[in-house]
Amino acid sequence: MLRFLLILAVFWLNIAHQSYAETISPKIVGGTTANSAPPWMAALWITTDLDVGFCSGTLIDSQWVMTAAHCVDVTDSQGHAPTITAVIGQADLTMLPPPAVVDSMIIYSNYDSSTMYGDIALLHLTTPQYTTTVTLPYSNASAYLPSGIQMRVYGWGETEAGVTQSEASATNFLQTATLTYWGFDTDFPDHIFAGDYGKDTCFGDSGSPLLYDGIQYGITSFGFNLTCATGVPGGYTDVSYYSSWIDNTLGWAESSDNSSSGGGGDIELVMLGLALLLLRLRFRFQI
């Protein structure tokens, strides 16, 4: 069933990707306003002459932010890369400090926007950020996470369930929620799944972290269906799948492996047996 759903999702995702200005990402539904932002939480503005996009990310090193590849895999009308700025550790986006500027980015070389494989990117900041960085898992650590645990998400995305892409808006105040972890599926080898009925990441939350016990296991990547919080788990890029790639890219390891292999374990997503599910990027663009 999931292979059939993936074919449908790929068809619709290809249509959506043709016009990135119309693409929206998720924000958190069913959460609460965070009292403060984790010091490593990043708000990202992706600017071209066509649009201004918004995503989230996490500070993984003093000058590196990790986010979803689909957030930054865009160009302007001349084919140039976007201008990206970041604000680190700020919960209230109505009171912004001077942003950090991204001077280069590295998108996973085998990123595929039609399947969302490799939906991970690293952004280099011009100036170091002297604050706490997020804790990353060891290689394939997600394979040992038991299904049913409660994981935490953060984001500035849509907060109302049942909202469609055209109706979505963002919030200026960081939201947080706990989501049930469901596990893996072989159709999405580099993703893990989490979500609940009435609680979900949604439009505007792309790139935001999924954490357990203070460790970031996921990057908000995509959702099924046209609206959020329907009870169908969302897809999160498995950070531990890319541990070796991150280490090598940042010079943390001497090996030159392209990426770590994915963990095992199938997930039975019974709720995915809906008549038609649309692969929904959790990314928002605004004029």
PLM regions with names:
Residues 15-21:
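Sec/Tat signal peptide C-region and signal peptidase I cleavage site
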Residues 44-45, 65-68, 72-110, 178:
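Conserved H-D interstitial segment of serine endopeptidase catalytic domains
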Residues 5-14, 275-277:
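Bacterial N-terminal signal peptides
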Residues 267-286:
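A cross-kingdom C-terminal cell-surface attachment/processing module
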Residues 92, 105, 117-198, 239-240:
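Chymotrypsin/trypsin-fold serine protease catalytic domain
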Residues 21-48:
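N-terminal activation segment of mature serine protease catalytic domains
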Residues 47-50, 70-77, 89-94, 126-131, ...:
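Acidic glycine-/aspartate-rich tracts in secreted/extracellular proteins
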Residues 34, 40-42, 54-73, 82-85, ...:
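C-terminal subregion of chymotrypsin/trypsin-like serine protease catalytic domains
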